[in-house]
Amino acid sequence: MAEERPPRLVDYFVVAGLAGNGAPIPEEKWVPEPTGPLRPPRPAEPITDVAVIARALGEEVPQGYTCIQTSAGGHPLELSAGLLGGTQPVICYRRGRDKPPLVELGVLYEGKERPKLGFQVLDTTPYSHSANLAPPGPGHPRTYLMYRRAAEGAGLHALGITDLCLVLPSKGEGTPHTYCRLPRNLNPGMWGPAVYLCYKVGLAKANTLVYEAELLGRYPEEDNEAFPLPESVPVFCLPMGATIECWPAQTKYPVPVFSTFVLTGAAGDKVYGAALQFYEAFPRARLSERQARALGLMSAVERGRALGGRAVRSRRAIAVLSRWPAFPAFRAFLTFLYRYSVSGPHRLPLEAHISHFIHNVPFPSPQRPRILVQMSPYDNLLLCQPVSSPLPLSGASFLQLLQNLGPELAITLLLAVLTEHKLLVHSLRPDLLTSVCEALVSMIFPLHWQCPYIPLCPLVLADVLSAPVPFIVGIHSSYFDLHDPPADVICVDLDTNTLFQKEEKKPLSARTLPRRPYKLLLATLTSLYQQLDQTYTGPEEEASLEFLLTDYEAVCGRRTRLEREVQGAFLRFMACLLKGYRNFLRPLTQAPSEGSRDVDNLFYLQGFLKSRERSSHKLYSQLLHTQMFSQFIEECSFGSARHAALEFFDSCVDKVHPEQEKPEPTPLVELEELSGSELTVFITPPEEPPVLEGSESTPQYCYDGFPELKAELFESPQEQQGALPVPGPSRSAPSSPAPRRTKQEMKVAQRMAQKSATVPELWARCLLGHCYGLWFLCLPAYVRSVPSRVRALHTAYHVLREMENRKVVLPDEVCYRVLMQLCSHYGQPVLSVRVMLEMRRAGIVPNTITYGYYNKAVLESKWPSGTPGGRLRWAKLRNVVLGAAQFRQPLKDRRQQQQQQQQQQQQKQQVAEQQKSGSSQTEPYLERPSPTRPLQRQTTWAGRSLREPSSPMGRLVKSGSLGSARGTQPTVEAGVAHMIEALGVLEPRGSPVPWQDGSLSDLSLTGEEMAPGGSPGGSGSALSAQSTEALEGISGRGSKTSGCQEEVGTPRKGLGARLQQLLTPSRRASASRIPPPELPSDLPPAARRSPMDSLLWPRERPGSTASESSASLGSEWDISESSLSSLSLRRSSERLSDTPGAFQPPSLEILMSSCSLCHACDSLVYDEEIMAGWAPDDSNLNTTCPFCACHFVPLLSVQTLDSRPSAPSPKSSLAGASGCKDAPAPGGPGPVLSDRRFCLALDQPQLCNGHMGSASRRVENGAWAYLSPLVLRKELESLVENEGSEVLALPELPAAHPIIFWNLLWYFQRLRLPSVLPGLVLASCNGPPPSQLSQGPSPWLTPDPASVHVHLLWDVLTPDPNSCPPLYVLWRVHSQIPQRVVWPGPVPSCLSLALLESVLRHVGLNEVHKAVGLLLETLGPPPTGLHLQRGIYREILFLTMAALGKDHVDIVAFDKKYKSAFNKLASSMGKEELRQRRAQMPTPKAIDCRKCFGAPLEC
């Protein structure tokens, strides 16, 4: 898959200003004055001097000075009034431009502090008297004014003090808007009111014309479909308009002003812009006479006479637009372009640098975390990948917010935003407005501001301040030189750190906030506020290349950390504020109606309000009725694009504790630091044109100002432009949005895995939860592939129920979310409600993502149209019918009892008559049970007789099994007779398979149920004629096959051996796919049920099962009892007995084993030990060897056996009858095979069922890495993310992604979960040529997933011939039991049959320690002794299972006995020696893994 083109950093470059190529500017283009109350005209000159005169000493106001005689409210003002000896000081000031203006004032208390750096103390009057403002006396400190002046050469546009005033708080006067009040009282004495000095900083200028900015140039010229250039961009580039100004001729150009802005689309998406404003010369010829007079270029007295010594300048802006808020990089780039335009000459045009930056500078990504851009040898900028966080990316600067407002004012603004007040933020620094406004809307996360939001409002849009809705607007402070703010607006001055509100409005009080969260927030912000002065605040555009490469992260990393800490403090407050809100969400549980999306129907407002503190009810009452809270509840109920961020907030809510007065030790906003060896991509400047030999490189481009952009000078991109990607997570397949986990869910799952790894039981359940998560990731593909999708959804619902019963530890809610999403897609709202009820029953509170999918399924799906009344009536009728049937049941029971009594009477009479006749040739009469009695399963040794009642081996078999029943051989034969009697006549069906000594043969049973009461071991009754003929037919066929097989043996032995087949009807049928025989018509319906019904309805099986022989259950072909119960999941999806070819032989068989060899110690590590050794890391493939503690990658071995013939022929189809003259004709009924013998026969060149001839089996072997469920889930999610969920149902999956495929198949088969994977194996294998399909349909060529059998083995598939053979294999060799693979190597003489029997005898007598000691003695001490690849525990366990059958060995009891034996041996030999000789048992974690994943595998 080709790598996607990285997203661009910059999308557009624009130039804004006054349009027109030398043409006069129309006067109607003037910007209209905004509506609102007007102020007096602002002064044209700043204040350059301030003085204090003493009226009592006869001093007069100096010439050119203005005296402050009244307060701001118009009250008479006199300092130190009424005091004896007072000088009656008066403050005066002077305006002008002959010197730099004053920029700051202060009050100095002499003797208590020192003057600030850069300030001058005004200690004398212009007449050389003391300028002390305080009254005379020893108790009053001498008070002086001090000031700071702007630097020399600051220019015309330097900020300075433009106005002064005095306020009297005792008269109710407050600080005027946009003024800064000095905190020191000018009248500190006991007499007289307190007086405070206020001053205003601004830009004093006159002779200015303001016009609306227009677009002068742009690149690229064409709009991109995903991101067209907004038309209002020029207005935002020059928010105060495109001005024409008249300056003195020798005035220097001011420093360019950097500003930022945000454009919000209709869908809420943001576009970030950065502009650089500068001045350039403007021709006088373009001005009309009226415009020239307004600028002061012409005399107002003498009409038409131009004034000299004047220069005309206009303001222009260059800007970039991006989807990324990389403001420092934009500032550096725009500053470079401006310097490039005012310097020169250059060899490259300006357009080359613009196009190079747009096309070749990408936004940082995980593959490119650092990008160093060199624009020139002296201009560099560094782009770093933003901190990975679930919080939305924005241009907010919480440090700027805290620096300019302080902790208390920041909290007050938080309260104003939460209650949706009108906020007007203003400053003289336009680059500060966007950062602070973005922080204001980000501090209320997860709430999203829904009202008008303009961080930098242009002058032409200032009418929004009169809007009757809440808003957050940022504007330049010069707006208030002409207009007063509206009365209902809260004004925030970032330059003076003040909040201004009209007196008639009740001021905001932080006391309405929750007490403890407020105190903690205030304390945290105060602590961080004190650390801000030590951080780096220098301009990044001036940073050198050495600084960017070495010290940038060290210096700026501290600032980033503080930024996250401030954001985390606000986030914790919001989490405490909304703690427990999910408990008051109201899920939809019925068909939607009008008003279903109302907040009152989605959220219990009153209940949530009552759960809060009474002192905060006022705040919550306002908050719950805001637009942003309503939108928040709707997003939580129905999902949105912010679902990942909302889910992260839910995790924060779970972490915080509002009652605590200290923050949690774990920060809510975690920083993911990049590694020190991260990759840095270096981007060089654009290449200069080559210089021809013999010629000099002469610069060609020189500019007097910023030039007009020329399209022919732009460089074309090197690669084809594509759609501009939108910032955010990469796309995923549209068909599978629900399976995708958020980053927060991945973090939680990782922490949960690390925690579970320390607890054995939790680790096993954690792995199990990830396995179920894998299946639900594949569920969409499975649902699309099955005929009945509704049944598949119900199957998934039953899987959820099974997960709850097994107490699975789910790391996330993906399982529920996927099913709810599918319910919504396929219109199953009722099932979605049931899934939600299951979640609540399991104690899981759905997060925002899951809750959204649930409500979508309920709201958007079509509900059943039928009324519930009809269903209720049908239910009542059903109950009536069932009730009547229950009343009739005693009559049936009485009639059956009477019939049984009559039969018993008749049987007793027959027995009495036969005893009288004295006949000894007839067989004993057995009691005939009712045909409806449930069958029970019983197994005997075929080569050896049943164990004696005192046999110690019976103690290991499971309790309740008939294999350990104490009885005589006639009793067993009587039980066989009873079962045959219940079934009726079994027709002869071809030649049987040869019976070896020590093996079992099976007969096929089709009945399941018998009447309660009879006993299979009863005696004293006679066989019926049909059952006797059937039994004789079986014995006869066994004697007629002497030409093809060995002699069967004694009738008693043959009858005992046949018991295995009588007790395995369902397993034989499922393996052999042989059609059932026709049953007599007089059998009851229960006896006519198909053998496959026992697989589909395991609840009807008897509760106790008999033990099986080693010939069957000890082999690798047996289906475990737990595998039968797993098929109950298929009841809701499909019935095997209804599928075509359900009784066909398997076309493909797959053998899988996870047993892996540790090459460090040459030991085999088994499945549960591999699981226990996995690390809780989704990127670690290694496991830990339990013997040597070495790490290695386990392998999953796979062997496929393809039985499909390449060319079926009549000769091959008859090959099954050529070996025996009594074999049935082709196409007739095949032999009666046990599943063991059937599977073993598949290794032979022919089958005796008449369906397949001499077809060779294609065997393929392979081994792939065995992945932990954590690793596999990560890989599967990546695959689905990149290629969509459809890839999981494609036949190319096994070849394209073999590791993922075979691991999925292993886990799904291990947990007995339905999937499409077996069918993909069949579809991916090479079948016969198409020409052969015309010869007729063959069941072997049908791509039916049911014709694929998957066997999971415990041991290795192919044994190592150089190693010592396992004991269970030797047992089968000595017992002459056919095996799948013949042992290829030599067998040591010490491993004899007597040794094996001795080990089994010790195990049966509960003397496991003697068995272990015997093996250790036989093997000898290392390194000279025999080396077993399997541990002692594994050898004894497998040997016991081979002798008794794996379903009849209680492994839990065996583990207890082995543990006791190990402890007993450890007291004499030592634990360390036993571990060296690998005699220890598996760890508790491994045992729990085996127990949690179900029954043990086959071996």
Curated annotation (Swiss-Prot):
Keywords, ordered alphabetically: Golgi apparatus, Guanine-nucleotide releasing factor, Phosphoprotein, Repeat
InterPro entries for this protein: cDENN_dom, dDENN_dom, DENN_C, DENN_Domain_GEFs, MABP, Pentatricopeptide_rpt, TPR-like_helical_dom_sf, Tripartite_DENN
Biased composition (Polar residues): 933-942
UniProt PPR repeat ranges: 775-811, 812-846
Domain of life: Eukaryota
Biased amino acid composition, Pro residues: 34-44, 1074-1083
UniProt domain dDENN: residue ranges: 528-644
Disulfide bonds listed in the record: none
Domain called MABP: residue spans: 44-203
Pfam families: dDENN (PF03455), DENN (PF02141), uDENN (PF03456)
Molecular function per GO: guanyl-nucleotide exchange factor activity
Cellular localization per UniProt: Golgi apparatus
Domain uDENN: start-end pairs: 195-369
GO CC terms, sorted: Golgi apparatus
Family matches, as SMART domains: dDENN, DENN, uDENN
Modified residues (Phosphoserine): 951, 1090
Record region (Disordered): 26-45, 717-744, 890-968, 988-1115, 1204-1226
Compositionally biased region (Low complexity): 729-739, 897-915, 1103-1115
Function: Guanine nucleotide exchange factor (GEF) which may activate RAB10. Promotes the exchange of GDP to GTP, converting inactive GDP-bound Rab proteins into their active GTP-bound form.
Protein known as: DENN domain-containing protein 4B
